[in-house]
Amino acid sequence: MRLISKKNLLSAIEPYPDAQSAIESWYQLIKDNDCQWLEFVRNGYSRSVEQVYGYTIFNIKGNQYRLIVQINSRTRIIIFTKFLTEAEYSKINWNDRDEVKQKLG
């Protein structure tokens, strides 16, 4: 898989040094495995993955952070969308598609 916006991801986690090693592990998982489906990612990532309105949300470092990406398994591309703390993540109404799209861009 190829990650689009890796530079933006690294910028987003800069204020959170405690998350950096977890992000590096996540990146190695997607880089080293040419996965084509979400089940592979779930199996390799302790099943701490959710899908909401086309976004894939990974729990990072337990439940302290959320890494939000869009995955196109056909083209094998992952697009970084947002990196949120648990507090930021909890403020979003995940049942409201319009709010999710607005908050995540």
Q: Model regions: which residues?
A:
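Basic, Lys/Arg-enriched alpha-helical interface segments
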Residues: 1-64, 73-77, 86-105
